[in-house]
Amino acid sequence: NLLGSFSYCGDGSVIRFRKISRMKLTANITLDELTKSQIAERKGINNNPGPQQIENLKALAVNILQPIRSHYNKPLIISSGFRCAQLCTEIGSSINSQHVADNGAAAADFEIPGVDNRELALYVKRELEFDQLILEFYRDNEPTSGWIHCSYSTEANRNQSLRAFREDGKVNYKPWLE
């Protein structure tokens, strides 16, 4: 049981002990990888997920992250996984982001060093069931540019594929049809 190793405070916050932060969600993905945030640490923000959020993060790890890790046999660099609402506000993200891991879904931003991010996104698109896949800020002439955003829903996956790009100083999204 994932939830048995946590202590829950009366206010609903979670106390995570050092050994728990290394809790394995899959053979190669830990809870710590999905919750670590330099901004949260710097600002003193408690970025610990609650019980349902942990279950959603585990579903993301089992159905998206571990299959990628196993296919490429290389570690993923997760730049952003779980974000509590306070952290989302701090970085200018929506508190409705799937990174908050509520409503049966969770998301992560990641890449694999040495693997073309377009190739990585195509693998996810062709081989895995996902809710949303975004190839973010990838430049065709720079294979390691940008990163992948991918979410997984335990309820209903849309298999929505997008590409994010900057135009006139704004972030835009368009369907990714490859």
What is each model feature region?
Residues 62-93:
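Extended, low-complexity, intrinsically disordered C-terminal regulatory tails
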Residues 22, 28, 75, 107, ...:
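A residue-level signal for beta-strand positions that form part of recognition/binding surfaces
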Residues 1-22:
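Short, Lys/Arg-enriched N-terminal segments with co-localized hydrophobic residues
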Residues 22, 83, 98:
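Single, functionally critical "micro-switch" positions that shape active/binding sites
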Residues 25, 87, 96:
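Glycine-rich, flexible loop/turn motifs
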Residues 98, 102-106, 112-178:
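Catalytic cores and adjacent binding grooves of peptidoglycan-active enzymes
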